[in-house]
Amino acid sequence: MKIIKAKDYEDMSRKAANIISAQVILKPDCVMGLATCSTPIGAYKQLAAWYEKGDVDFAEVSTYNLDEYRGLSHDDPQSYHYFMRENFFDHINIDLNNTHVPDGSNPDAAAACSEYDKIVAAAGYPDLQLLGIGNNGHIGFNEPDDHFSKGTHCVDLTESTIQANSRLFDSIDDVPRQAYTMGTQTIMYARMILVVANGEAKAQAVHDMCYGPVTPECPASILQLHTNCVVVADEAALSLCK
């Protein structure tokens, strides 16, 4: 696991965007796994700015997002499909037919998850998987548990995750209680993993991810076993990594 220290959120975003753009430039038809938390927004904005300048071209890129709230349709303003269009896809030249997010509107969890696993596998899995990390060490919506998950599955969100995500909703009561998410096994199939983290609230999770025991109690700790994982984090998020 390689750790790149950034001064602050803006520096973290630019460093992460540099890695992502390098992947696109080196392999224009690359498969990208994308994250839908708030941490990567700065990187998405930087990539969109570079696209506007003609520095990077997303025309041949295909993307597969980690997760989606169960029960939300693609056009729901709180859905991650909507989030990706608002924060990234609508600002670059990507073919929307090549963008993929789990179908949160499908009430049949088993069918929705199985279908998403099939399309990710058919794409050959991501060349680069972008991840954020939750305060409790979750990646995607893989919450702390007594075992690591495999493929895409339906999860009950923990109270800490519901609380953390409530800032994006009018009320905590509006936050969905379940989500569809890629499993840790699927994430680990990516050829490169890029984790972004910022802020003091992430410090313990980042420390446990990088230096703690590999345990499903901190799902991100499994990334220690990946052969090509890069962590880009600001000084606050790395404050416990001495």
For each feature predicted by the language model, list its residue ranges.
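Class I SAM-dependent methyltransferase SAM-binding "motif I" and its flanking Rossmann-like core
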Residues: 140-184
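ATP/nucleoside-binding phosphotransfer catalytic cores, i.e., glycine-rich phosphate-binding loops
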Residues: 182-185, 189-242
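Glycine-rich N-terminal segment of FAD-binding domains in flavoprotein oxidoreductases
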Residues: 26-52
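N-terminal glycine-/serine-/threonine-rich phosphate-binding loop
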Residues: 1-32
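Ligand-binding beta-strand-loop-alpha-helix segment within the catalytic cores
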Residues: 56-129
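Short beta-strand segments
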Residues: 33-37, 65, 102-103, 130-133, ...
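Glycine-rich phosphate-binding loop
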Residues: 124-149
